[in-house]
Amino acid sequence: MAPSQLPPMFNPTPQDIEMLLAAQCHLGSKNLQVHMEPYLWKTRPDGVNVINIGKTWEKILLAARIIAAIDNPADICVISARPYGQRAVLKFASHTGATAIAGRFTPGNFTNYITRSFKEPRLIIVTDPRTDAQAIKEASYVNIPVIALCDTDSPTDFVDVAIPTNNKGRHSIGLVWWLLAREVLRLRGTLASREAEWDVVVDLYFYRDPEAEENKEIAEEAKVPGADEIGAGAVESGFAGENWETQAPGAGVPGTAFAAASAAGATSWEADGADWAASSAAAPAESWAAEAQGAEGAKW
């Protein structure tokens, strides 16, 4: 990194430099656009152009000063048609109050006042000049300044402030937007001092695949505790470890109590049966015979 020409208070901290290197913000493409040559550090033997991250930091500070100079944050429009930058621009807009356009840019947003989505921003910030070419083209028609994250092969036509960085990686895009948002909040006074840590982690600005997150949640829900112990593994790990020889008092002899209860019950039922048999055999038989004989004698 070349010596910085900034005041000492604006110099990046070692942690900022480590984050820029870890996110691979310094790795450009193999192609080099002539207007991006001043931001080039060197070219590796494999042909990859390495960006000077000192220039990247200086341009982040310059862009933050331009953003902080606008009184109404809603007059700033942040745009990203590239999927890796859509989450970042939405988070940047929520933290700084800017207007976000994540996804497809509708032609005529800045030039056709009849459309419902017509906007008149004072400044636009784009993630990639190549994918957001329609927004830059319309901004040039109505004299709107443009700040763009530019790679070594990015076209710089109608771009007023180019932030040299890797605009193709999800981590590099998210980190640059996070650093830009933090610097804007510092200049506005939202953060108490430059030494104060921002409580928003940079991971919130990174792109996340919705399908991958959904599949991860489904896999976590499907994993039930103990599900891996079904089958032979359960016998070896769970049931085999238990002591099946241990018996509770009275265990293993279930017929003892049942036999005693059945014997007592049988005695009482036999006694009742004997009483019923005696009563039915004595009195009812005689009475029925007497009645039958009396009826026959009276009739004949």
Swiss-Prot record:
Output the InterPro entries linked to this UniProt entry: Ribosomal_uS2, Ribosomal_uS2_C, Ribosomal_uS2_CS, Ribosomal_uS2_euk, Ribosomal_uS2_euk/arc, Ribosomal_uS2_flav_dom_sf
| Similarity field | Belongs to the universal ribosomal protein uS2 family.
Q: Where are the transmembrane segments?
A: none
Any one GO molecular-function label of the UniProt entry: structural constituent of ribosome
Q: Which UniProt keywords apply?
A: Cytoplasm, Ribonucleoprotein, Ribosomal protein
For this chain, the annotated S-S bridges are none
Region entry Disordered, spans: 269-300
Function (record text):
Required for the assembly and/or stability of the 40S ribosomal subunit. Required for the processing of the 20S rRNA-precursor to mature 18S rRNA in a late step of the maturation of 40S ribosomal subunits.
User: Record's GO cellular component, any one?
Assistant: cytosolic small ribosomal subunit
Subunit architecture: Component of the small ribosomal subunit. Mature ribosomes consist of a small (40S) and a large (60S) subunit. The 40S subunit contains about 33 different proteins and 1 molecule of RNA (18S). The 60S subunit contains about 49 different proteins and 3 molecules of RNA (25S, 5.8S and 5S). Interacts with rps21.
**One biological process term in Gene Ontology:** translation
User: What PROSITE patterns does the entry give?
Assistant: RIBOSOMAL_S2_2
Task: List the subcellular locations.
Answer: Cytoplasm
What Pfam families does the record tag this protein with?
40S_SA_C (PF16122), Ribosomal_S2 (PF00318)
Name the chain's protein. Answer: Small ribosomal subunit protein uS2
Coiled-coil stretches noted in the UniProt entry, renumbered to this chain: none
Q: Please report the organism this UniProt entry assigns to the protein.
A: Aspergillus terreus (strain NIH 2624 / FGSC A1156)
